[in-house]
Amino acid sequence: MQYWGKIIGVAVALMMGGGFWGVVLGLLVGHMFDKARSRKMAWFANQRERQALFFATTFEVMGHLTKSKGRVTEADIHIASQLMDRMNLHGDSRTAAQNAFRVGKADNYPLREKMRQFRSVCFGRFDLIRMFLEIQIQAAFADGSLHPNEREVLYVIAEELGISRVQFDQFLRMMQGGAQFGGGYHQQSGGGWQQAQRGPTLEDACNVLGVKTTDDATTIKRAYRKLMSEHHPDKLVAKGLPPEMMEMAKQKAQEIQKAYELIKEQKGFK
């Protein structure tokens, strides 16, 4: 009820013997209270809507990416299940993710339309958009190879989300470097991806932070702080990341932290 503030304001004014002007003041104060409460309720509703859309779109696009290679195999489904495990999805959340994955596999899935809708509810929150794209990149090469069709789908996603080819290619390099810190995959010379077999290098660490090995300490620290802020799990959830995906944000933040520690050690700064 959006008029309780007015009722309480008038009641308090009458109890205090405020007279006509006291009642008017009580109405005004109560109206302001009701308006603020209404805005707060609308914010929570929009937040839930944004999180629900992020969740559904994430798994729909995963399904679309998988189908872009051709027939969806048991191995593809197993990989999707592993990603759900990484997000600690169980019960209703897992069922919702599986249903969304199936929706995305449809031949007529409207990818561009879905991406425009997703971008509109993000309200320019680049960290949310970035997290979404990073999840899709992980899903695309989780089977050990980045199929040309998957790459084309990723290019469409990036384009509709306002990310240039240059930015996208940088994201790929950052994911490549991050694989050495998170037990994932690294890029082969042929353009595919394979499971990491070596330890992380200074170049890997710099790729994670999006810096060069020749950059100075100030530049590296600035990049590190920016990335940690953009991947802060609580901040991302507050902006619309579904709570179920907080674990992936934590894992990404850990990769960034490990990369930064390696850079500090090898370049000799604190």
UniProtKB/Swiss-Prot annotation:
Domain J: from-to ranges: 204-270
Pfam families linked to this entry: DnaJ (PF00226), TerB (PF05099)
Gene Ontology molecular function, alphabetical: protein-folding chaperone binding
Transmembrane stretches, start-end: 7-31
Subcellular location: Cell inner membrane
Membrane topology: Single-pass type III membrane protein
Entry domain remark: The transmembrane domain is a dimerization domain.
NCBIfam families: PRK09430.1
Name of the protein in its database record: Co-chaperone protein DjlA
Organismal lineage: Bacteria, Pseudomonadati, Pseudomonadota, Gammaproteobacteria, Enterobacterales
Gene name of this polypeptide: djlA
